[in-house]
Curated annotation (Swiss-Prot):
UniProtKB keywords: Amidation, Amphibian defense peptide, Antibiotic, Antimicrobial, Cleavage on pair of basic residues, Secreted, Signal
Composition skew (Acidic residues), residue ranges: 30-40
Function: Has antibacterial activity against Gram-positive bacterium M.luteus NCT C2665 but not against Gram-negative bacterium E.coli K12D31.
One GO term of the biological process aspect: defense response to bacterium
Name by which UniProt lists this protein: Dermaseptin-related peptide
Protein source organism: Agalychnis callidryas
GO cellular component entries: extracellular region
Coiled-coil regions, chain positions: none
Amino acid sequence: MAFLNKSLLLVLFLGLVSLSICEEERRENEDEEEQEDDEQSEMRRSLLSTLGNMAKAAGRAALNAITGLVNQGEQ
């Protein structure tokens, strides 16, 4: 009976160790995924900012060109 109890305790202990290792690996994977998501969000924000700046510059250039044409037509 004592042998059976020791075996059962050993199996339970090994199961807990295995579960602990699996949970740790899962947490590490979740942390890596969060970092990747953060990096992707940062890249998107950077890209949107760049596109916004380009659109502003294009709008200013178009406005300047139209203003120049209007001024030439008035002369």
